[in-house]
Amino acid sequence: MITLITGGSGSGKSAYAEKYICHVSNEKGYKEKYYIATMQVFDCEGQRKIDRHRRLRAGKGFITIEQPRDIQNAVSKLQSESSLKTGRSALLECMSNLMANEMFPPVDASGMQTTEAEKEALDGPENMKDYETAQISRVSKKVLKEVSILSENVAELVIVTNNVFEDGVCYDQSTMNYIKAMGIVNRGLAAMAENVVEVVAGIPVAVK
């Protein structure tokens, strides 16, 4: 079963997601409860966010898996490979970080991102537009497929995602491409999920 929890920044969605999965796991008697963390630390603000999330889940029995990209690889890190998926639940926190990591990979030995190196080889705006469209499609399909694989290996999967579509601001092209990809993925996840909840000012509102 998949539950998608969405909301704006600071809405309380993370706290609600942790409370929700702890309740469900206790109620259904899941023996293993995983926290799949996708955030990478690049600055002090990022470290503060990670520290806050660690404090939130301290003492709640989570087994933490650090998986900033290639989310299907988290499956091989589930501790009891021989146990049935019926004994496992997982919280994926969060989709917006995962998508950013997939779309903007780390720099290579030359100091250039892989995507930047590919763009350097293009010789015109039409080629660039085709490349960006293909990248949005490729990353979106990859993430949705890998989340589906993960969901097949746990009894309960809770996914936290961000609502990044309502500020009405035009950003640079790379950011707009990211927002488009997030829209595709969030719609795909909502279609896959049995439950969709939006958290508004700390209040969960059932959408599906």
Where are these regions (language model features)?
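Short, glycine/serine-rich, charged loops/turns that create anion-binding
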Residues: G10, Q40, S96, V164-F165, ...
